[in-house]
C-alpha cells in the first residue's frame, strides 16, 4: 500500500465501504458507470481516472500500474492547504488556483473541494483509515487562472490519536458529458503557521550612501490571516507595515540611521484571523555600515 516512484511517495487511504464518508465512494461508482456485480476492494486513483475492484493475482503490481499512469498527468490546479486542531475538530484552510483551462463551479461541472482526514492506524488493511471527509462545492464560478478559498471543518473526532492525524486537500470536477470525475490536484495540509522567506536579512552599506536598502519578504500562511509588522530598532522599517496574507512587505534598512560597523535588530510579523488563529514569525536583520571595499 506504499511505495515511491520518481521520488514521489504514494499512499492508499482506506474507508469502510459500508459507512462511506464524503463523496469518494460516489466518485468510484461514477467512474464505473456500468451494471453487474463488483467485489471488494474498490480502489480508485484520482477521482476516478483509474479504478479497480476485486481480487488481483498481484495487488502491488496492479495498483502500481494505476498510480504510474496518474503520476504522468500534469496538475490542473495549484493548492495551498493548512490544518489545525480546534477542540475536538480539525479545521482546514484551502486556497485553489484554477489551471484547468476552463471555468469551475458546482453548477457548471460539479467542481468540488475536499479534505480527507486520516489516521495512521490499522483498522482495516492499509494502516491508514479515513476519519472525516468534509467538502464544499466550488461556488461562485472560478474563471481559468482565478482563485477559490474555503475553510473546511470536521465533526467532532473522538477516540483518535491527534498526533497520527493528517489531512490532504484536493479538488475535482466532471470534465465532459460522461459520469466520471477528474481530480485537478491534491496537496498535503501543512500545520497552520506563518512562514517568511527569507528568514533573515543581512545588508552592507557604504557609509557615504544616502539610499536605503530594501529586501522583499514573502509571507506564507492560511488565506484567512492578516498580519502586522513591528521592528525593534529605529533603523529598520517595513512597507507596508500591515495587510492581508496576500500582500507582501519589504524590509527597509535606513542607511542614514546606521552607526559605523555591525548592528542587529529584528522584525516580528504577527498574524491572526477572525476565527481565532494567531501565529508569528521573526526575521533577524543585520546591517553593516562602513567604507566601500574594492
Q: Where do the protein language model's features map onto the residues?
A:
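A short beta-strand micro-motif common to beta-rich folds, especially ectodomain repeats
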Residues: 215, 259-275, 283
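Beta-strand-rich extracellular modules
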Residues: 170-174, 254-256, 270-274
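Beta-sheet-dominated interaction scaffolds and their linkers
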Residues: 191-220, 255-260, 289-294
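Short, conserved sequence motifs used for protein processing/export or organelle targeting and
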Residues: 7-191
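Typically the conserved alpha-helix immediately C-terminal to a functionally engaged Cys/Sec
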Residues: 1-7
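C-terminal edge beta-strand
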Residues: 277-290
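Surface-exposed binding patches on compact interaction domains or structured appendages
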Residues: 193-200, 220-251
Amino acid at each position: 500500500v506504499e511505495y515511491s516512484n520518481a521520488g514521489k511517495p504514494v499512499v492508499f487511504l482506506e474507508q469502510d465501504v459500508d459507512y462511506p464518508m464524503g463523496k469518494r465512494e460516489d466518485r468510484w461508482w461514477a467512474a464505473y458507470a456500468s451494471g453487474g456485480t463488483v467485489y471488494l476492494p474498490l480502489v480508485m486513483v484520482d477521482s476516478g481516472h483509474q479504478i479497480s475492484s476485486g481480487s488481483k493475482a498481484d495487488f502491488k503490481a496492479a495498483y502500481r500500474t494505476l498510480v504510474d499512469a496518474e503520476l504522468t498527468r500534469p496538475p490542473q490546479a495549484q493548492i495551498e492547504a493548512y490544518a489545525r486542531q480546534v477542540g475536538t475538530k480539525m479545521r482546514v484552510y484551502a486556497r485553489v488556483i484554477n489551471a484547468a483551462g476552463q471555468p469551475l463551479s458546482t453548477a457548471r461541472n460539479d467542481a468540488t473541494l475536499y479534505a480527507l482526514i486520516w489516521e495512521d492506524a490499522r483498522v482495516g488493511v492499509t494502516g491508514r483509515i479515513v476519519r472525516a471527509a468534509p467538502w464544499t462545492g466550488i461556488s461562485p464560478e472560478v474563471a481559468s487562472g482565478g482563485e477559490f478559498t474555503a475553510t473546511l471543518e470536521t465533526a467532532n473526532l473522538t477516540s483518535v490519536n491527534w498526533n497520527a492525524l493528517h489531512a490532504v486537500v484536493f479538488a475535482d470536477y466532471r470534465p465532459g458529458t460522461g459520469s466520471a470525475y477528474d481530480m485537478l490536484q491534491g496537496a498535503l495540509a501543512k500545520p497552520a503557521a506563518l512562514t517568511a522567506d527569507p528568514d533573515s536579512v543581512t545588508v552592507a552599506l557604504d557609509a557615504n550612501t544616502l539610499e536605503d536598502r530594501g529586501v522583499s519578504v514573502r509571507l506564507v500562511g492560511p488565506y484567512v490571516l492578516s498580519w502586522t509588522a513591528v521592528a525593534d530598532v529605529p533603523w529598520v522599517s517595513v512597507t507596508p507595515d500591515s495587510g492581508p496574507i496576500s500582500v507582501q512587505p519589504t524590509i527597509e534598512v535606513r542607511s542614514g540611521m546606521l552607526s559605523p560597523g555591525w548592528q542587529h535588530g529584528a522584525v516580528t510579523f504577527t498574524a491572526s484571523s477572525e476565527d481565532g488563529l494567531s501565529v508569528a514569525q521573526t526575521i533577524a536583520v543585520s546591517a553593516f555600515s562602513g567604507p566601500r571595499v574594492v
